[in-house]
Amino acid sequence: DIDFAAVLEDASAKGTVNVYHWWTAGGEKDAIESVIDEFKGAYGKVKTKSNAIPGGAGGAMVMKVKVLQQAGKSPETFQAHPGQEIQPYLDANMLLDLSKLWDYAKLNERILPGIKDLLTAPDGKNYVVPIGIHKTNVIFYNIHVFEKYGIAIPDHENITWGEFWDICDQLAAKMPDGEYPIDLGDRKGWPACQVFEDIMMGTDPKIYQDFINGIYNVEDVTKVLTTYAKLMDYVAPDHSSRDWYEASGQVVAGTYAMQIMGTWMQPLMTSMGQEYGKDYGIFTFPGTDGWFGMNIDGFVVSNDSADVEAGLRWAYNVSSTPVQQRFSALKESISPYTDTPDDCYNELTLKFKNELISDTIRSYPSFTHGTALPWSASMSLQTQVQEFATSSDHDAEYFANKIVNILKEAGVKGEWNLVD
């Protein structure tokens, strides 16, 4: 049995921690470097090895970790989304129960209200230490493009579907050949799936709840995909040839006016010298006013690595206030902890944080980002939705049948309660 207090309080301990994460884009890279820097300050004799596994939405991580574990080289700690995504690791019996770490670091008292349930596994234990929260249902737009083509920017961020289609129509009419109202940047598939998720929530939260609970019908999914097909009329036709961050670069360049993306796009915009309110603005995805699409990043610890104690020290340090302050400022993410001071946030991140803790805004779990659907179903869904987005005719009913079959085959049975 591990003496958690003794391990975590031993600042002179030696060892090596292999840290696997998926942060490679501008701003994200600086954020993870700041965590490593703080870790070195706390446990100076422990060597840190940073390993970036890009692949997006955490999908590539599960496969990488499985391979490492089978080779007897489980990483000491690695990034994960809480919820269904950690199930393959639990099935492999490779995660260390961090409930005692949670007690020692007083995480139960410190954690933001409303996210604790997402961080508790079905067996009642805690395996994840959260590091940051992002909102998924957001549209970023280039203010200069709107001004260039004389598109009136609404004085409110919670736009309706009608306002959204009107903006798309105006942009499409005025932008020259080779420039488009929207880009997806879905070379890796998951951004296309996240748009599907946003459209589903923006169509009807009840359809979303049923979908993640495994109560599905082809008609509902067809309805969502029909809206998606309409959206594709405004999207750059070569959208799947770019990664999400390359698409963001083209939004900054003015080739595309808008991108539907989570708030991890913020630090990327900052790294490209873009300022919120001056260079870019945001809309809440149409139909999702009053909802916060939840994406929680965290770290888990392997119970079978070469240095389990080093992994524990890393996970503990992630929740410390100095790490949270530096990381949240650079990543422009919301700290999961109530004792992280608000002065580490810029204007936009603070706005999102206030939304998250507001009594009038409800959060919902992402199925693209590992929380709400089994990992295998989420991966298959990403592939299928990307195929839909890249298909020439966007046949909603055909793909709705394929998507429903994915949930059937995965035996999806959820107990999510989003709508009264």
Predicted regions located by residue number:
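Hinge/lid segment of periplasmic solute-binding proteins
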Residues: 2-11, 81-137, 195-197, 277, ...
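Long, aromatic- and glycine/proline-rich binding clefts that accommodate carbohydrate-like moieties
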Residues: 119, 280-283, 329-383, 387, ...
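Extracytoplasmic "Venus flytrap"/periplasmic binding protein-like
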Residues: 34, 38-114, 118, 147-150, ...
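Conserved C-terminal helix/tail region of periplasmic/extracytoplasmic solute-binding proteins
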Residues: 2-5, 11-12, 16, 147, ...
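Extracytoplasmic/periplasmic substrate-recognition and gating elements
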Residues: 41, 47, 71, 149, ...
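Extracytoplasmic/periplasmic solute-binding protein
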Residues: 123-132, 137, 147, 162-213, ...
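Glycine-centered hinge/linker elements that transmit conformational signals in sensory
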Residues: 166-170, 210-241, 285
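A structural signal for short loop-to-beta-strand junctions that line the ligand-binding cleft
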Residues: 67, 75-76, 107-146, 180, ...
